UniProtKB/Swiss-Prot annotation:
Pfam families membership: RecA, RecA_C
SMART domains assigned to the protein according to its UniProt record, in alphabetical order: AAA (SM00382)
Keyword Lipid biosynthesis in record: no
InterPro entries noted in UniProt: AAA+_ATPase (IPR003593), DNA_recomb/repair_RecA (IPR013765), DNA_recomb/repair_RecA_CS (IPR020584), P-loop_NTPase (IPR027417), RecA-like_C (IPR049261), RecA-like_N (IPR049428), RecA_ATP-bd (IPR020588), RecA_C_sf (IPR023400)
Gene Ontology MF annotations: ATP binding; ATP hydrolysis activity; ATP-dependent DNA damage sensor activity; damaged DNA binding; single-stranded DNA binding
Biological processes annotated in GO: DNA recombination; DNA repair; SOS response
GO CC terms, sorted: cytosol
Keywords: ATP-binding, Cytoplasm, DNA damage, DNA recombination, DNA repair, DNA-binding, Nucleotide-binding, SOS response
Described purpose of this protein according to its UniProt entry: Can catalyze the hydrolysis of ATP in the presence of single-stranded DNA, the ATP-dependent uptake of single-stranded DNA by duplex DNA, and the ATP-dependent hybridization of homologous single-stranded DNAs. It interacts with LexA causing its activation and leading to its autocatalytic cleavage.
SUPFAM superfamilies per UniProt: P-loop containing nucleoside triphosphate hydrolases, RecA protein, C-terminal domain
Binding site for ATP: 72-79
PANTHER family attached to this UniProt entry: MITOCHONDRIAL DNA REPAIR PROTEIN RECA HOMOLOG-RELATED, RECA
Gene expressing this chain: recA
Name recorded for this polypeptide: Protein RecA
Length: 368
């Protein structure tokens, strides 16, 4: 027994010596013991700007230092979802950038969703290599918290732009993405920036069985992305005869930091994105914080009193907009139940002891 103990102690000494030698040769932090170096137990996350998606992601938002892919069909709400994320990071005093490869950023729409466009870094690159070099520079600066690339399909290689119409450039974009992601993955992780790639869907030719849909830019992004979110447009939302939006499903098809395949059902309203009150209402109904009796919705407050919200979803959501205290209470209850970040104003409003819950500080985004 004593022999085994001395052998184990000797192994530990040799291991310590090996780690020190590798660090000496390759630099501090190049190799480390898991128990002494890396700590994934307290994963730094940034809220996505959509409460339903924060719940579906399992960790309360997008993890820092990771690559995220948001993909879907045309006009499904991909850019809207990314703009909500930009606005959320800016609320936490973060620095954000938008690489507009499609040259289609609607500044007024971004402003309506809460993005401070005066403080938004915007780039409209001429070709794919330039766009990815700009992303690399932003990441390596260590000051940009969130970078959105819209979109992968628009990252056209320089050779294709300079070539003639009809020239074959098979696999050029896929090679470009593969090379760029090999270079970006390490620097993104070290800088703690979040990079969101928006991607489009294409149909594979000749697929008889299985899903014929695929994303552009090859398969490298599928491998390097920590989280992949599919945005799928559903039934139209109508107000009378007019369509005012679409029911949209956000499905987490890949997740390296929590269980995947969870989904969020949200309302995408034209000109407003994903309204907070609609999102909270949908979650509250699903989790029975709001009771439904036929077409009527009611809510039981903290004092046990039943409050009627109205007949139908539209009237009930309008009631929540007119009564922000009830909306705040529902948001606080949902965030606490799912162990999500609770903003300061909700803690001060509903907790006597301000030390309870997860607080969001303006400095927290920069420190993590």
């Amino acid at each position: 027994m004593a022999k085994n103990d001395s052998k184990d102690a000797n192994k530990e000494e040799l291991l310590e010596k090996l780690v020190k030698e590798l660090e000496k040769n390759h630099g501090t932090g190049s190799v480390m013991l898991m128990g002494k170096g890396l700590d994934n137990s307290n994963l730094a996350v940034v809220p996505s700007g959509c409460l339903s998606l924060d719940i579906a992601l399992g960790v309360g938002g997008y993890p820092r230092g990771r690559i995220i892919e948001i993909y879907g069909n045309e006009s499904s709400g991909k850019t809207t979802l990314a703009l909500h994320s930009l606005a959320e990071v800016q609320k936490l005093n973060g620095i954000v950038a938008f690489v507009d490869a499609e040259h289609a950023l609607d500044v007024e729409y971004a402003r309506k969703l809460g993005v401070d466009v005066d403080k938004l870094i915007v780039s409209q690159p001429d070709y794919g290599e330039q766009a990815l070099e700009i992303v690399d520079s932003l990441v390596r600066s260590n000051i940009v918290d969130l970078i959105v690339v819209d979109s992968v399909a628009a990252l056209v290689p320089k050779a294709e732009i300079e070539g003639a119409m009809g020239d074959s450039h098979m696999g050029l974009q896929a090679r470009l993405m593969s090379q760029a992601l090999r270079k970006l993955a390490g620097s993104i992780n070290k800088s703690k920036s979040i990079v969101i790639f928006i991607n489009q869907v294409r149909m594979k030719i000749g697929v008889v069985y299985g899903n014929p849909e695929t994303t552009t830019g090859g398969i490298a992004l599928k491998f390097y992305a920590t989280i992949r979110v599919e945005v799928r447009k559903g039934n139209p939302i109508r107000e009378g005869k007019d369509q005012i939006g679409n029911e949209t499903t956000l499905k987490v098809v890949k997740n390296k930091v929590a269980p995947p395949f969870k989904q969020a059902n949200v309302d995408m309203i034209f000109g407003r994105g994903i309204p907070k009150e609609n999102d909270i209402f949908n979650i509250a109904v699903e989790e029975e914080l709001i009771q439904r009796k036929g077409a009527w919705f009611s809510f039981i407050n903290e004092n046990g009193e039943e409050i009627s919200l109205g007949q139908g979803k539209t009237n009930s959501v309008s009631y929540l907009m007119e009564n922000p205290d009830i909306l705040d209470y529902l948001e606080y209850t949902i965030r606490k139940k799912h162990n999500l970040i609770i903003p300061d104003y909700l803690i001060e409003k509903f907790e006597s002891n301000s030390s309870k819950g997860k607080k969001v500080k303006s400095e927290e985004l920069q420190e993590n």
